[in-house]
Amino acid sequence: MTGLLNRIIAIGGTTAHQVPKSPETVRKDYIDGPECITAVVAEGAGRVLGWQAIGWWEGDAHIGTFVDPGCQARGIGAGLFARTLIEARAAGIATIHASIRADNVPGLAYYARIGFVDYAFDPDFALKDGRRVGRVSRRFDLR
């Protein structure tokens, strides 16, 4: 999971993360830390093809999705979300939030395709390096 996330960070453009993560940080932030709710992984050919996690952030359940750039638009994200929905419902989550860079065209398309709807927009959201990319906030209601 760490290797995939760090490849996505290195490529840039589809995540607000700009600094590579350690395996310990990925584990704490996405798998079994105190703020983690769910985590699902898609594997194939002996490697991680994608993963999705929900965790508490600012009082809301937020989702993060990371799919190998060479495997996007092949149903991996939809498969992850189907499994995530089962776990989210079992955890009693009413609403899943997604915060997406406004310049992340594939991410915006993915979350729209699986049923997330816009509820806020921050045109001034900036990355750590100062670039303003904007941020779209979307949600998926489970009830």
Predicted regions and their residues:
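Glycine-rich phosphate-binding loop
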Residues: 71, 75
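A beta-strand edge to alpha-helix "cap/lid" segment located at domain peripheries
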Residues: 76-77, 81, 99
